[in-house]
Amino acid sequence: MVLRLLTADDADVFWQLRLEALRNDPASFADSAEEHLKTTVETARERLRKNDPASNFVVGVFEQGQMIGTAGFFRRPNNKERHKGHIWGVYVRPQSRGKGVASALMKEIVRRARELHGLEQITLVASANLPAQRLYKALGFESYGLEPHSLKIGNEYVDDVLMVLWL
């Protein structure tokens, strides 16, 4: 398993994996597959081109040269919120789950975030995905709130669990 920062050269596979994530786990993401299909690989390339290890990056997990998971991190740009970072878009392919991939991915994001001067907390949103919530708690994240009906998919609502890791 290889973990590394994604670059603009990874845009094609990142865009495809994001689409897979949105299709496989729609309740875990605010974006929909339909919305994602309105974007282009070039949009993903531009996002990855703007990666900055000090404030905004995406980490990919690779096994035998294939990307099997991703997670992103961003830090608030304004002075009053620079003490906060946020993890987004955590996804591991179904066939790679239960093998420690998500744990390794999250630990890498947290490791990189801990190196950032002045960062005091990392937040994330956990959906109804109980295995993900258990992983986040095992890594030291704690719940600080619940956003009821955060997402609406068709006629069903999804509540989000708000979590924080104090650094």
Spans of model-derived segments:
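Active-site acidic-Proline motif in GNAT/NAT acetyltransferases
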Residues: 93-95, 99, 127-128
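Glycine-rich acetyl-CoA-binding "A-motif" of GNAT/NAT acetyltransferases
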Residues: 66-69, 131, 157
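Conserved catalytic-core motifs of GNAT/GCN5-like acyltransferases
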Residues: 123-125, 137, 142-158
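Acetyl-CoA-dependent GNAT
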Residues: 8-9, 15-16, 20-89, 93-94, ...
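Conserved GNAT acetyl-CoA-binding A-motif
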Residues: 113-126
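Residues forming the Rossmann-fold NAD(P)(H) cofactor-binding site
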Residues: 99, 103, 107
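Conserved N-terminal glycine/acidic-rich loop preference
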Residues: 86-88, 105, 131-143, 148
